Amino acid sequence: MYAILDIESTGGKYNDEGITEIAIYKFDGHEVVDQFISLVNPERKIQSFVVGLTGINNDMLRHAPKFYEVAKRIVEITEGCILVAHNAKFDYRMLRLEFDRLGYAYERKTLCTVKLSKKLLPGFDSYSLGKLVKNLGIPITDRHRASGDALATVKLFKMLLDKDTDKSIISSNLKLNSISSVYQKLIKQIDQLPNAVGIYYFADH
């Protein structure tokens, strides 16, 4: 089972962003069997260039649910699923970032349709979602909105599944994303390091 998703964010400093919209389509390989689409109040300002790109502004999100209010639904709809996204590294990072703020370690296997497309559909000048689906004749509406991009990714992924007849390429591109508790602790410590140039002393207590 697959959870095909797209996330829109506030933009801004790396790992200081917030999710503004999320769309998840639960896909059994043939059809969508469940879906979740929601605006999200990121509790931080959206960068102006992102407003221009997505059309999502701060006023639209003022009364939207905060991430903790939709977190349970996200866990439930993705439980036992492989997360699929166009540039999955970004979407998965954003989910993990929001869950980490809640003190929850969110882990799922992931597949990236950018990487899969380059292997199964070689020869295109661009593998951006908009240009790729246009070249493939896949309709896309509401570009740069979560539901429109995620639904186009569903159609693209179905095409990729059909191309990979023995599923060997998809299997070889599956990322397990299992992070040990020790590594998670180190990542948190690294994130807390100051950005200023200087000499720092590390003590092992």
Regions found by a protein language model. Give the residues of each.
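Conserved non-catalytic scaffold segment of RNase H-like nuclease domains
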Residues: 1-108, 122-144
